[in-house]
């Protein structure tokens, strides 16, 4: 690595706005929240996955416009699908909302330069849309839980 490139990274680090620091912090913590939801449901940690997801989350916080966020979401979702066998657990919407927040915040951080601030109108719009997505996610989970717990007699026509 040449010194000019390193100096560019240092200048970018120093020029990062406070708002971008908060966005990057959420980018690191949200997928860890999804892993915590899996741990809370299953009762055991996945140490290797914790390291992998932490590294991927940190990489996506540093470069939010890269594909590392996709890989982190895929690892978290695959871990959930492999280890959890219940659809009626309240940890499912918690993990889903964590991954939704991760995606939304990472995309928002990638939209603006590191030294820039997100305009309030844009921030409110993104927050409103993310909250709508989260509420639809939780609503769909509630519908699945209600249908899963329903005791309906068999029907040959269905």
What residue ranges belong to the model's regions?
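Membrane-interface helix-boundary motifs at transmembrane edges
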Residues: 59, 118-122
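Membrane-helix interface "capping/anchor" motifs
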Residues: 58-72
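Alpha-helical transmembrane segments and their cytosolic membrane-interface
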Residues: 1-46, 93-105, 115-118, 128-133, ...
